[in-house]
From Swiss-Prot:
Component of the Mediator complex. Disulfide bonds: none annotated. This is Mediator of RNA polymerase II transcription subunit 1. One of its GO terms (cellular component) is mediator complex. It holds the Pfam family Med1. Transmembrane segments: none annotated. The lineage of its organism: Eukaryota, Fungi, Dikarya, Ascomycota, Saccharomycotina. InterPro entries: Mediator_Med1. The keyword ATP-binding does not apply. It comes from Kluyveromyces lactis (strain ATCC 8585 / CBS 2359 / DSM 70799 / NBRC 1267 / NRRL Y-1140 / WM37) (Yeast).
Length: 426
C-alpha cells in the first residue's frame, strides 16, 4: 500500500511541475532537484559569482550565476562514467542546459531536461565503482539520431532527423525539408519494469540493426514513437503490446450519400482503421520505423487526399465514427505481421506519411453530412457516368484504368494517381 501511495504522490508532483514549474529562482531550482531526488549545494566562487552543483549517481551539473540566478553565466555537465561525448547541444551548437535557464521566465524547459537526465541516469546499466558498463543510455541517446538518419536514408525515405530542439532533450523526425514535424522518438518507462531493453546499433554496411552483445541491456524502458497527429492504422497490422492509445476511435468510410454524385465508392477494407498516434516499441523492433513512416506517407498523400476529393462539397453535418449507416468492412482479416516473430521490412505493416498538411482524417471526420432531401436528388444521376473507386487499406482502383498500391508503387506514383483522380473530378 505504501508503495502505491508513493507512486501516486510522485505522479501528482510530476503533473504539478509540468503544469506550473515555477519561476527561475535559486530556491525553485533547489526544490526541483529535491523532487527529482537530486543532491544540490551552493558554493561561493568569488564576490560576484556563485555555483549551484546538482548531482545524481552519474550526472553532475554545475550552474554558475550572479545575483540569485538573475544572470546565468554558464552550465556544465559531467558524467561519472567513461563516456564524455554526451550531446547536450542543439544543431546551432548551443548548450541547451544553459539556454533552458537563460532568458526564460519559468523552469519548464529546464525541468524537462533535468527529468530526462534523471531518467537516463536511473536506467543506465553502469557500475561506477567497477567501471563495468552494460548499457550507457547517455551514449545510446547521443548515437541514436545519426543511426536513425542513416537507416531512414538507406531505406530511401524522405525524412530528416533532428535533436535537442527548443532547448529541450529529444529526437524528432521531420519531412524532407525539415519544416513539418512528423513524430518524436522517445525513451519512456515501460509498463512492465522487468522488460529487457537490449542495445541495437545500426550497421550501415549491412543496413541492419544488430545486437552486438546480449549483456548490453537494461530493464524497464521502451522506445516510443509519437506522431504529431492521429493516423488511421489497420487494426490487424498492430499487436496489442505496441498500442498506447487505450480506446482509439475507429475511422469509418463515408456513406455513398456523403460523396460527390459522380463517385461510386466500393469498400474493400479487410481491417478496421484505428485512429492512433503513439506506439510502444521494444528496441529489437526498431526496424519497424520505416514501415511507420511509409504508412504515414500513404495515409497523408493517398488516403486523406482521396477522401478529400470524393466527399461532397455541400456536406453539412459531421461524418460519424460510429458503425451506424456506414459501409462496413468485409470480414477478411490479415494476421498481424508483428506477432510472435521479428518483423521483416517486406511485410505490410503499420505506417504513416508526410505532406499535404491542410487536410487530416480528423478534419474529414468532422465534416458535415448532407440531408436526406439532398440524398434523394442523387437518385437521378446517370449511374454510367459515376467514377467507380475501390478502396482497400493497401490499394485503390479507379475503375480499370488506374491503380495505386501501397506495396507496389513509390511516392511519385501515388502523387500521379491523385493528380489523375483530380482531373476526373474537375
Amino acid at each position: 500500500m505504501s508503495d502505491a501511495f508513493v507512486e501516486l504522490l510522485d505522479e501528482m508532483i510530476e503533473r504539478l511541475l509540468n503544469y506550473k514549474p515555477g519561476s527561475r529562482t535559486l530556491p525553485n531550482v533547489i526544490k526541483l532537484c529535491q523532487t527529482l531526488g537530486l543532491e544540490s549545494f551552493v558554493d561561493q566562487v568569488d564576490s560576484t559569482k556563485s555555483r549551484l552543483s546538482i548531482a545524481s549517481n552519474i550526472v553532475v551539473i554545475d550552474i554558475d550565476y550572479e545575483n540569485e540566478m538573475e544572470t546565468i553565466l554558464d552550465v556544465k555537465l559531467v558524467l561519472a562514467s567513461n563516456f564524455d561525448k554526451f550531446n547536450y547541444f542543439n544543431e546551432k551548437g548551443e548548450n541547451i542546459l544553459l539556454t533552458s535557464l537563460s532568458d526564460v521566465q519559468d523552469l519548464k524547459a529546464f525541468h524537462h531536461n533535468l527529468n530526462f537526465l534523471v531518467f537516463l541516469d536511473s536506467f543506465s546499466n553502469i557500475d561506477i565503482e567497477s567501471g563495468h558498463t552494460s548499457l550507457d543510455l547517455f551514449k545510446y541517446y547521443t548515437d541514436l539520431p545519426k543511426m536513425l538518419q542513416d537507416y531512414i536514408s538507406d531505406q530511401h525515405l524522405p525524412f530528416t532527423v533532428k535533436m535537442n530542439e527548443n532547448s529541450t532533450f529529444g529526437v524528432s523526425i521531420y519531412d524532407a525539408q525539415g519544416q513539418t514535424k512528423i513524430m518524436t522518438v522517445d525513451l519512456e518507462k515501460a509498463p512492465n519494469s522487468d522488460r529487457s531493453f537490449y542495445e541495437y546499433v545500426y550497421d550501415s554496411k549491412l543496413k541492419d540493426w544488430l545486437n552486438e552483445s546480449s549483456d548490453a541491456s537494461t530493464q524497464g524502458i521502451n522506445l516510443v514513437f509519437k506522431f504529431e497527429e492521429l493516423v488511421a492504422f489497420p487494426e490487424t497490422w498492430l499487436t496489442t503490446e505496441i498500442q498506447m492509445n487505450e480506446t482509439p476511435k475507429k475511422f469509418e468510410l463515408p456513406q455513398q450519400s456523403h460523396l460527390k454524385h459522380t463517385v461510386k465508392l466500393q469498400n474493400e477494407l479487410t481491417s478496421d482503421l484505428l485512429l492512433m498516434d503513439s506506439f510502444r516499441i521494444s528496441n529489437e523492433d526498431i526496424a519497424l520505423l520505416p514501415d511507420f513512416l511509409k504508412w504515414y506517407n500513404w495515409h497523408k498523400i493517398v488516403l486523406q487526399e482521396v477522401l478529400k476529393l470524393i466527399i461532397h462539397d455541400n456536406v453539412t453535418s459531421s461524418i460519424s465514427t460510429s458503425n451506424s449507416g456506414s459501409v462496413q468492412p468485409k470480414p477478411r482479416r490479415k494476421s498481424s505481421v508483428l506477432s510472435n516473430r521479428r518483423p521483416s521490412m517486406t511485410d505490410s505493416m503499420m505506417l504513416r506519411d508526410s505532406g499535404i498538411p491542410e487536410f487530416t482524417l480528423k478534419e474529414i471526420l468532422d465534416q458535415p453530412v448532407i440531408s436526406d432531401t439532398e440524398d434523394d436528388d442523387q437518385m437521378d444521376v446517370d449511374k454510367e457516368k459515376q467514377i467507380p473507386i475501390v478502396l482497400n487499406e493497401e490499394y485503390i482502383y479507379i475503375g480499370k484504368a488506374q491503380t495505386c498500391s501501397y506495396n507496389d508503387n513509390d511516392e511519385q506514383a501515388w502523387k500521379a494517381f491523385i493528380d489523375y483522380l483530380k482531373s476526373k473530378l474537375i
